[in-house]
């Protein structure tokens, strides 16, 4: 797989908007997670966000929280998640971006964690509870192991903070479309249409928009507003958890294909 930055560069040269689906590792089970990574890749995902289940996921809405709770109840560990990445990453076109909270990183040791996930084949990291002020040590460790640390910009961030985050973020900038937690919503916040040009004034890095995208029409709207990537989480997780694992995988495949078509 190519790095996050390189992949975005090739997409931009082709005039394409990136599709970035999210799934929670271990929900409904580890075997389905492994299959889902392959199915999402085949269905057109340009990157795949893989969430490590965590007991106190402050940024996540009810759908992803419930998925994490189910995975943890089955005893899913980071080591099991990385074992899946190790097995499948070489078969995928889409780089895998690990979505994890900071505590597991701190617990293992920052450099040791980065070495472990990089060795497994992870290409990027999103750490939603890592504030900019405390990110330099994590950023340095990620860089030393060839990982892109993707930082989040909130819609309420003042201009100075937006500039600082945009400068520090690697791979792309994760623009949070709404205040609050993740979760599918019936419409995309119109403020995103105002925030994208504001970000463009301070950076030429790719911008991915997430939190609340639930259908192809919303994905298309974000592309029209100028997003370089569209991140879809809860709507994918919900489909994967519906019915039997086979039914969930089929639903995710169909949904991902419809999203890809919408932003083509």
Curated annotation (Swiss-Prot):
Residues annotated as the enzyme's active site: 49, 60
UniProt keywords, alphabetically: Amino-acid biosynthesis, Aromatic amino acid biosynthesis, Lyase, Tryptophan biosynthesis
Cross-referenced InterPro entries: Aldolase_TIM, RibuloseP-bd_barrel, Trp_synthase_alpha_AS, Trp_synthase_suA
Coiled coil: none
CDD domains from the UniProt entry: Tryptophan_synthase_alpha
Cellular-component GO terms for this entry: cytosol
Recorded GO MF terms: tryptophan synthase activity
Catalytic reaction annotation: (1S,2R)-1-C-(indol-3-yl)glycerol 3-phosphate + L-serine = D-glyceraldehyde 3-phosphate + L-tryptophan + H2O
Known pathway: Amino-acid biosynthesis; L-tryptophan biosynthesis; L-tryptophan from chorismate: step 5/5
EC numbers: 4.2.1.20
Subunit structure: Tetramer of two alpha and two beta chains.
Family (UniProt): Belongs to the TrpA family.
Protein name, entry field: Tryptophan synthase alpha chain
Organism: Picosynechococcus sp. (strain ATCC 27264 / PCC 7002 / PR-6)
